[in-house]
Regions:
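Bacterial N-terminal signal peptides that target proteins for export
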Residues: 1-9
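Predominantly soluble domains enriched in secretory-pathway, periplasmic, or organellar proteins
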Residues: 12, 16-324
Length: 324
């Protein structure tokens, strides 16, 4: 009897001290606060704040959802956070000033853009070791990877190029010139195209992944706004490859683009200085980080209307959502 009571007591204590689990938790990096805000995507309410390293920017969740990776840019490291306990449990050797990164489809390799050193650092996530350092253009930032994991794309902001890198040899195999200050690279789900945003150029270049040539350039025009105020940054493409969302920076809008015709269909007004985007796993919402209004916006992907804005920390930048 005493043994049974002891087991029940231990179970009760474990229940009390265990962290609550939120379905499809949204993680937002706040670069001024040095925090990550967790939002429950079902209730669209913030539930917890985690203290992290200095100037957090890039953020992503491991494929199994057990760990959160955060670029602590001014600490020159990538921090590892346990998504069950929300404690920092380790770090990865990222190289100096990690800005953005991308995880391989199998979740085993992390590719990190090191803006200060003009490098892409390749990290074995499990072993926590550097596999390679790849020299790229000046001020690398945007990172994308093909669905088959064979090709990684890095954008260099000052060189104005998209570098296509073979993930086996870790060699650059193609350089594609794009417009000024490319900030993000996103593959279509079928791997046929890479979309590269140009913040100062005001365009998104659509690159054919087979020929490594720009096949189309998407430009944006918003009544009442100067062209210089429209600065494309984050890009996301729906799972069916039919629609894309582009964050337009100080234009305070997200552009909705037909990903088959490349026509802009709508501009969605969100918070101030929109940076990055992420889909919920079910694809029902795309979430924007709004840096100067210190909030995020949930956008319904059926109506392409904003549903709710949620206050987070100071200067939200990156966003990711835990898988189902």
């Amino acid at each position: 009897m005493q043994g049974l009571l002891r087991q029940l007591y231990c179970a009760a204590v474990a229940t009390v001290i265990a962290q609550p689990a939120w379905a499809n938790a949204v993680y937002v990096s706040n670069e001024k606060d040095n925090t990550v805000t967790i939002i429950d995507s079902d209730t669209m309410e913030p539930v917890k704040t985690i203290n992290v390293g200095q100037r957090p920017r890039g953020i992503t969740v491991s494929r199994d959802g057990k760990f959160l990776y955060v670029c602590a840019s001014d600490d020159d490291t990538v921090e590892i956070i346990d998504t069950a306990t929300h404690e920092i449990v380790g770090s990865l050797p990222s190289g100096p000033d990690p800005e953005l990164f991308v995880l391989s489809p199998d979740g085993k390799t992390l590719y990190v853009a090191n803006e200060d050193d003009n490098l892409v650092t390749v990290i074995d996530v499990e072993q926590k070791t550097v596999l390679a350092e790849i020299p790229v253009g000046v001020e690398p930032e945007g990172m994308g990877i093909s669905p088959d994991g064979k090709t990684m794309v890095n954008t260099s902001e000052t060189t104005n190029m998209a570098h296509f890198i073979d993930t086996t040899s870790h060699e650059i195999v193609s350089n594609v010139l794009v417009d000024a200050r490319p900030r993000f690279a996103q593959f279509k789900p079928d791997g046929s195209e890479v979309w590269v945003s140009a913040e100062i150029g005001g365009t998104v270049s659509v690159i054919n992944n087979a020929t490594r040539e720009v096949k189309h350039k998407i430009s944006f025009e918003i009544q009442g706004l100067r062209s210089e105020a429209i600065q494309p940054v984050g890009v996301r493409i729906t799972a069916d490859g039919k629609k894309a969302y582009v964050a337009l920076g100080p234009a305070n809008r997200v552009a909705v683009v037909n990903a088959e015709t490349y026509e802009v269909e709508k501009y969605v007004l969100v918070g101030q200085r929109v940076w990055q985007l992420a889909f919920t796993p079910d694809g029902k919402y795309v979430i924007s980080t709004n840096g100067l209004s210190n909030d995020i916006t949930f956008i319904d992907t059926q109506s392409d209307e904003p549903v709710k804005s949620v206050t987070v920390g100071a200067l939200p930048w990156g966003v990711t959502v835990a898988p189902n």
